[in-house]
């Protein structure tokens, strides 16, 4: 889009190519001192303009109206992004694109995965090192299954081939008939994989399985956190700090924003780090926008320091790929009509 380049240029965000599987930009040192925000919870960000929108698919037979819920890794010299796309008809799917530089992201070819004919979305991608395979985790609704809605997975050995993913397979077989759960996230420590999800009622839940049993064999659910939170929880390991971070989306003042919690173990307990709209992980009050385009900081993913199941991030360089929309866009239509676009936050501390 002609307006995209100037928005990116004035943002001050380094939308450069990466230099390897670490996802660190070529102009950046591989390590920095950890941000003081991990101690005091005072995050400060600068945002790019929208760097990915629905692109040419706005003219498709079933026009795309939003791209959202991004997941991203840097591998083999390229960024690989999977995201939910919503069509005018209400149908949703997962779309894949890859590129060398974020400056060219919106011009990258788009590939709709078409893994299922019913509702599926909200992907997470990672390389599961014990299997030497890429995993795509997502939520799927299939009326022929019990329960009809839950976490599924597909795998491939060829990340850049969107046609190589296996058909969806359910992950959790011991769920109740009508569980309250969505936005599934996997992270592993040295012995277990952990599955986190929310239930739209202020609860964050966790299940676990032995690494040898992944992606099956999950325990019953355990309450991980109770707070004023909503959806889209993501959990990471802070590289070199021996701590874990959970960020989770919340609602306040008719907007979407992000909170943050820390723990020493994935089993918890989780303690607040930035847990209000006035003292947030990411909200309008702590984000600088040189060209205003969003008032909402919704379902995003931190740029990782690697590609595997440990979900490590560099605590000295914090970047957050998120979905954004203005107040007018967010409040003037139902959720399905919001024209979400993707932007990038970069920490200023």
Regions found by a protein language model. Give the residues of each.
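Bacterial N-terminal signal peptides
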Residues: 2-17
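Conserved glycosyltransferase catalytic-site signature
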Residues: 296
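Active-site pocket scaffolds in enzymes
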Residues: 299
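Beta-rich carbohydrate-recognition and catalytic domains
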Residues: 23-232, 237-293, 306-349
């Amino acid at each position: 889009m002609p307006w995209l380049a100037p928005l990116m240029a004035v943002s001050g965000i380094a939308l450069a190519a990466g230099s390897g599987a670490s996802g660190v930009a070529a102009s950046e040192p591989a390590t920095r001192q950890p941000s003081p925000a991990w101690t005091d919870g005072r995050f400060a960000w600068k945002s790019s303009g929208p760097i990915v929108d629905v692109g040419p698919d706005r003219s498709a037979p079933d026009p795309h109206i939003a791209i959202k819920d991004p997941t991203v890794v840097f591998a083999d010299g390229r960024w690989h992004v999977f995201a939910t796309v919503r069509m005018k008809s209400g149908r949703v799917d997962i779309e894949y694109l890859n590129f060398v530089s974020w400056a060219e992201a919106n011009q990258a070819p788009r590939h709709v995965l078409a893994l299922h004919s019913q509702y599926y979305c909200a992907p997470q991608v990672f390389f599961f090192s014990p299997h030497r395979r890429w995993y795509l985790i997502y939520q799927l609704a299939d009326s022929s299954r019990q329960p009809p809605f839950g976490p599924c997975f597909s795998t491939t050995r060829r990340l850049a081939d969107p046609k190589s993913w296996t058909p969806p397979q359910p992950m959790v077989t011991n769920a109740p008939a009508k569980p309250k759960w969505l936005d599934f996230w996997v992270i592993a420590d040295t012995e277990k994989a952990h599955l986190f999800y929310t239930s739209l009622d202020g609860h964050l839940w966790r299940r676990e399985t032995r690494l040898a049993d992944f992606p099956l064999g999950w325990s019953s659910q355990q309450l991980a956190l109770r707070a004023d939170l909503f959806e889209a929880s993501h959990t990471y390991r802070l590289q070199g700090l021996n701590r874990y971070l959970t960020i989770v989306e919340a609602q306040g003042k008719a907007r979407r924003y992000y909170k943050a919690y820390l723990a020493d173990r994935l089993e918890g307990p989780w303690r607040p780090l930035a847990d209000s709209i006035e003292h947030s992980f990411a909200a309008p009050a702590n984000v600088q926008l040189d060209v205003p385009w969003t008032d909402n900081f919704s379902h995003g993913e931190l740029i990782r320091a690697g590609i595997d199941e440990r979900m490590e991030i560099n605590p000295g360089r914090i970047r957050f790929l998120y979905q954004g929309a203005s107040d007018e866009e967010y409040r003037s239509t139902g959720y399905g009509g919001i024209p979400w676009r993707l932007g990038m936050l970069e920490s200023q501390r």
